[in-house]
Design a protein with these regions (language model features):
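A solvent-exposed, charged loop/short amphipathic helix patch at secondary-structure junctions
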Residues: 388-406
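Cell-envelope/extracellular polymer assembly enzymes that use nucleotide-activated donors
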Residues: 368
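Conserved RecA-like helicase motor-core motifs
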Residues: 331-336
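Acidic, metal/cofactor-coordinating or nucleic-acid-engaging core segments within structured domains
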Residues: 402-438
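SMC-family hinge/dimerization module
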Residues: 363-365
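Active-site beta-strand-loop-beta-strand hairpin of nuclease catalytic cores
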Residues: 371-379, 383-389, 653-663
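Hydrophobic multi-pass inner-membrane translocation pores used for secretion
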Residues: 353-358
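Acidic, metal-dependent phosphodiester-chemistry machinery of nucleic-acid enzymes
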Residues: 1-329, 340-347, 360, 397, ...
């Protein structure tokens, strides 16, 4: 196979290139070539380097025969040759992985291959402030910090101090060598160069650019002086995240193990030489290794492990709840709620509100978090278990088992709760009785993992094919880190619900594929995470719409293609780096905002918080920029007319979509004292809801300046209005009475081009 030959050839070339030069000098040159000197202006989408390149070279140098004792690199040494050989080896291996995954017969083979590729190439998947938030909660408590001290030889506070000192000392050492070169230049830039000056410049240049090993390493003594900790404690911290040189393997064997997933530098990202110097291969000290190393150390002690596991689960649940509640501001929130679920083999309806013995017909169950916001219920399950080492190295069977324990269990538990709420409109809670949830019309599920599984979570359709999750209702599967970042960006309840709807919509799940959840979030923020809806399905849902043409169906088939989601986090990175204090250049927070006025309307509905505000606000945000602008333009005309004549005016807006057919009726009254305006407007809305078979309709009464005065909501569908008399319907729908005018509006609602037909149903009336 061509890829196999290229891999062997590249590794042999790499072995020769790294055979003799000083280890840390050589690694320093490669680091200078592959790692940006600063995050200022860094854009991941434009970066051509990968942390895996430096790690592969470091793994081979660690196991070479010369060890850490070799002369400095010759000035003619070209690190570019080393980098090119390493990148060729990695690329060839990725081709082999791709071939293996597509030829595998297990339903998870493709996903396992994608997981291995991500584990090989992606590093630094946590923003500093978010990582600190999680680690502080997890390790900052006294009991866990004491466990760390007992089993690792240092406390969490010790680790934090060493981390800070390591970064500061590295920067000082590195800048010192460059400052000497800069000093000589500034002092003598106008002087005639002498032989002595040339020698000094050459020596400074050689130290800074060809012998960077000294300036890129630190010692425990340096860290001790800077941190104020003892040298022994600093050594314990550094050694916990360091690997020594080892000649028991050959460089080729080390490279092959690295590419198989046995990466010694993934968790322990320091390389230590025989003189006690530490070279940082990448990222902050222990950035990806603290939790796995600590858990590995305490797992043999059963009592300590059990106590920590319980604490770990509580922390993950608490952090998930805290950040979701901050955005959603639920009307009711239940953490660790206990309820009765159906006994296996029995129907969920046996546990309806009329059940007289729920403890007999059901069995105890617990949900991590249930939130009710308006008529929306959100079920959240949190899993703190880790993915095993063998799964990370490509074991398909072990990956399947680990995913079933995390994603699969979270999905089934959330789905079980959602099914009970949808079918019974409530739950039986032990010792408390019936929990009425009859107002809930829509149920969504979130599965949160403490482990970063982005490359797996982003492929919901593959999880369905692998039977980790059944077809049908899909949860949003997200890591705790990405959930925290998402809630910092989508800080409106309506925005987060819209993302939740789109992200778990079956059309989106099967049409978008990626390896990073935050790329999906930023794609959504940019207004690009959407699909044209199946016109046949939409017409079946809304039969009063015009008949579809062959051109409609042909366009849908043409556009129904898989989209590979690349890197979209550049703006997010810039903002996070700035807020974390890693760069000086100010950066704006990415936000799902528009300048069409819809944001102000959504905020006004949220502030009023009348029934139906959340689902309707989300439906309004779901439109395209053109559709939102059309709605706001129509509202502007409505208010202008109200200010002009002081009469009642109304605007009907249809919002058909994949999550139901909703509508909004905006209206004004006869000035501030028109007490009957809302009731009359609500009757008109009900008639239109019945006429067009609308699922839910929000009525919004505005004053002439656009402030919300009151709302009314019907969320149980048009069928509940059949008890109305024909006379009342005709009265409520008085669109063409003397003194009233009606006109067509620009189509609204997001259903692709199909919206044009339903737009004909959007009407405005002006009534005296």
């Amino acid at each position: 196979m061509k890829a196999r030959k290229e891999l062997d050839r590249s590794l042999q070339s790499l072995e020769g290139l790294i055979a003799q030069s000083n280890a840390f000098d050589l690694l320093g040159l490669v680091r200078m070539y592959t790692v940006p000197p600063t995050l200022e202006g860094h854009r991941e989408s434009e970066s051509q380097s990968s942390p895996a390149t430096l790690e592969l070279v470091a793994s081979m140098i660690r196991h070479r025969a010369a060890g850490d004792d070799a002369p400095a690199p010759d000035p003619s040494t070209d690190p570019g040759e080393i980098v090119i050989a390493a990148e060729r080896a990695i690329d060839a291996h990725l081709w082999l992985l791709l071939s293996e995954s597509t030829e595998g017969h297990h339903p998870l083979a493709e996903l396992a291959g994608q997981f291995r590729m991500t584990e090989l190439r992606v590093r630094g998947r946590q923003y500093q402030s978010v990582q600190s938030t999680v680690e502080d909660e997890l390790f900052g408590v006294a009991a866990v910090s004491e466990l760390m001290d007992r089993h690792l030889g240092f406390s969490y506070n010790d680790l934090q101090r060493v981390r800070v000192a390591f970064g500061e000392q590295w920067s000082q050492n590195r800048s010192g060598s460059l400052e000497e070169l800069h000093r000589l230049y500034e002092e003598h830039k106008d002087d005639e160069p002498t032989d002595e000056l040339r020698a000094q410049l050459q020596a400074a240049m050689h130290t800074a650019m060809f012998k960077p090993g000294v300036s890129m390493t630190v010692t425990a003594e340096e860290i001790s002086q800077r941190s104020g900790l003892s040298s022994e404690t600093c050594t314990s911290v550094l050694d916990a995240f360091a690997v020594p040189f080892d000649t028991t393997r050959t460089p080729i064997e080390a490279a092959q193990a690295f590419l198989r997933g046995d990466n010694e530098l993934l968790l322990r990202n320091l390389l230590k030489d025989s003189r006690g110097r530490y070279f940082g291969v990448g990222g902050d000290l222990g950035i990806d290794g603290l939790r796995p190393i600590f858990e590995e150390a305490i797992k043999p002690v059963q009592k300590a492990w059990d106590r920590y596991q319980k604490h770990r689960g509580v922390v993950a649940e608490r952090l998930a709840a805290r950040h979701l509640q901050a955005v959603l501001q639920p009307d009711r929130s239940y953490e660790s709620i206990k309820y009765f679920r159906p006994i296996p083999g029995t129907d969920a309806v046996t546990l309806g509100s009329a059940c007289d013995r729920p403890a007999t017909h059901g069995e105890p169950a617990e949900a991590d978090l249930l939130m009710v916001i308006d008529d929306i219920a959100i079920c959240v399950e949190v899993k703190a278990a880790a993915i095993s080492t063998s799964a990370r190295r490509g074991s398909v069977l072990r990956l399947a088992k680990d995913l079933e324990k995390t994603v699969g269990d979270a999905r089934s538990q959330a789905d079980r709760l959602a099914d009970l709420i949808e079918r019974n409109h409530g739950l039986w809670v032990p010792d408390e009785g019936w929990l009425d949830l009859s107002e809930v019309r829509e149920v969504r599920s979130i599965a949160v993992t403490l482990e970063d599984l982005s490359s797996l979570n982003c492929s919901l359709d593959a999880l369905v094919r692998a039977r980790v999750m059944p077809a049908g209702r899909l949860p949003w599967v997200v890591s705790l880190h990405d959930l925290i970042v998402t809630t910092r960006i989508l800080d409106r309840a309506s925005e987060l619900l819209l993302y939740l709807r789109r992200r778990t919509d079956s059309e989106v799940a099967t049409r978008y594929s990626g390896i990073d959840e935050l790329d999906f979030v930023m794609l959504f923020v940019e207004g690009q995470l959407w699909v044209d809806l199946d016109p046949a399905v939409m017409h079946a849902k809304y039969p009063k719409a015009p008949r579809l043409t062959g051109a409609d169906r042909a366009r849908y088939r043409k556009e129904a293609q898989l989209t590979r989601v690349g890197t979209h986090t550049d703006d997010l990175d810039a903002w996070m780096y700035y807020t974390d204090g890693l760069v000086d250049a100010p950066a704006e927070r990415p936000s799902f905002r528009s300048d069409d006025g819809m944001d102000e309307l959504v905020d006004a509905l949220a502030a009023h918080r009348g029934q139906g505000w959340l689902s309707t606000s989300t439906d309004l945000l779901n439109g395209s920029s053109e559709q939102r602008a059309s709605i706001m333009s129509s509202i502007t005309r409505l208010l202008r007319a109200a200010r002009g004549d002081g009469k009642r005016h109304s605007l009907f807006v249809a919002l058909p979509g994949p999550w139901g057919f909703s509508a909004v009726v905006f209206g004004t009254g006869h000035g501030a004292r028109d007490s009957g305006a809302l009731a009359a407007l609500s009757d008109y809305a009900a008639a239109k809801q019945y006429q067009l078979e609308v699922d839910r309709c929000l009525t919004v009464l505005l004053n002439a300046e656009g402030a919300v005065l009151g709302t009314a909501y019907r969320g149980r569908g048009f069928r509940n209005l059949r008890r109305w008399s024909c006379g009342r319907l005709r009265w409520a729908c008085r669109i063409r009475q003397p003194g009233c005018a009606s006109h067509r509006l620009t189509p609204v609602g997001q259903v692709g081009d199909f919206a044009a037909g339903l737009g004909e149903l959007a009407e405005a009336s002006v009534c005296g």
